[in-house]
Amino acid sequence: MTLRGFSLGTQNLYLRSVVKLHDHFNRNPAHLTEAEIKAFLCFTLSNNPIAASTYNIMIHGLKFFYEHVLNKKMLAIELPRHKEPQKLPDILSSSEVERIIKATKNLKYRTLFILIYGAGLRVAEAASLCIRDIDSERSSIHIRQGKGGKDRYVILSPVMLKTLRLYWKQCRSKASTQKRPTDFIFIGRTGEAISTASIAAIYRHSKKLAGIKKQGGVHALRHAFATHALEAGADLYVIKQLLGHASVTSTVRYYV
């Protein structure tokens, strides 16, 4: 899977699908029939509160296992699919974003939220930023191995740069870590990159403090970035590039 360019997250999801199939029958998946595999998928779909995206990833994982690992075509038939509901994100206004950021008293997390909103970053992209990714001379941030394993550059605004420098001076430079200076900007207690779970938890707390009732997690800041840029007259293709979407179709589906 690594040779095919699959991310570690995708690999884990695919492997988990095979493990679940094994545990369901308590038998080697290589010896299961086509009918048994379909029965497992139907059981999963009807007996578990599983998200459509998770279920469909399970199908892709099993197809990969049988077709590319075992070299069998037994899953070439149509498998039961779970239709993904088309839900539009609940967009935050610029004033709501400002309230959330102001409610975040911890400078590390406030800096993270400013970056996610200001550059349209995915949470994992912000969490894994390194010093070498920040180019103050060109006012850009290098996003390495984003979703789909693709690099891209995003805009580093003066406000973002100022906030980053303040955070580095007051917090990051004093942090106790054995890491090299070129490593992660935002570190957790272990000295590794801060976890996306902790970012999500602080965001929920800040949103509550700000009195924001709209649904959605920290990814809403990225959605707000794209929507506000479009409303300000930014070109759709430019937004697509900044977001790192593989196709402009994805951008249109959410923001047009």
Language-model features and meaning:
Residues 1-256:
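Conserved catalytic core of the tyrosine transesterase superfamily
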